[in-house]
Swiss-Prot record:
Annotated pathway: Pyrimidine metabolism; UMP biosynthesis via de novo pathway; orotate from (S)-dihydroorotate (NAD(+) route): step 1/1
Family: Belongs to the dihydroorotate dehydrogenase family. Type 1 subfamily.
Localization annotation: Cytoplasm
Gene it is expressed from: pyrD
The reaction(s) this protein catalyses: (S)-dihydroorotate + NAD(+) = orotate + NADH + H(+)
Protein name from the UniProt record: Dihydroorotate dehydrogenase B (NAD(+)), catalytic subunit
Function according to Swiss-Prot or TrEMBL: Catalyzes the conversion of dihydroorotate to orotate with NAD(+) as electron acceptor.
GO MF: dihydroorotate dehydrogenase (NAD+) activity; dihydroorotate dehydrogenase activity
Enzyme's top EC category: oxidoreductase
The species this protein was found in: Thermodesulfovibrio yellowstonii (strain ATCC 51303 / DSM 11347 / YP87)
Amino acid sequence: MPVLEVKIGNLSFKNPVLTASGTFGYGLEYSQFVDLNILGGIVVKGLSLKPKQGNPPPRIYETPCGMINSIGLQNIGLEAFKKEKLPFLKKFNTNIIVNFFGENLDEYIEVAKLLDETEGVHALEMNVSCPNKTSEWRKMGLEPELLREAIKRVRLHIKKPLIVKLAPQVTEIALMARICEEEGADAVSLINTIPAMVIDIKTRKSMIGTLTGGLSGPAIRPVALRAVWEVAQAVKIPVIGVGGIVSAEDALQFLIAGAKAIQVGTANFINPIATVEIIEGIKQFLIEENIKDINEIIGSFKE
């Protein structure tokens, strides 16, 4: 049987298939469909210091090759997560990664410090790239020097592995990744959803509760794949590929492009066992190709 284990920083993953934040709830919601022990890791829904109500409905609109969402980072807050959700997750033999955010940099630091002290949380994913927040909040992921300051200050306060989730709508995503690396991030995940909109031609208003949302699903996969390939060449820290992955073939493309691991997002809504099928598909590919260790194909793209 081929070896599927990969390492991100000092953290080992039994396989490179993780869930994407915001598409797998807090794990409990999918536990009736998926044996969570099988997964390489679970990235839970983005958490803030206090509960957030999120954006007004409607929040989701299906597109021909994906969907536009405007959830607005609704969540139960850090303390409720620790009391109500984390005890369940700790029962499983898989890595728990908490995606987190703040309304300002001080709040980012506060959430990160509390998560760093929380038993059962293996790594943190810092969300600096959600398109469904105010422009002031979003600047951190779009402006190099603001990103640098944010990573530097958060890193000072935590010891656990830090993953930074990058925005696609920047001029040089490789530059942003290098900044993360220089300031001590252990890995980068990319890409987040792409800012998008949809209009009702009769009312001439947005068909979601906000003016714009974030596009995800197969429509963004080629964009994400190119970004992963570009970033993987620019940094030495691990890259986690995200964006439109629905099959083992999709996942393998990201690994070949240089991703150390991948996250499955929108596919979970369509097929609750997508992650398991992708893991099995990767395993079968390696057997058929007589590849003993998945690390042999990571970054094996030929120009």
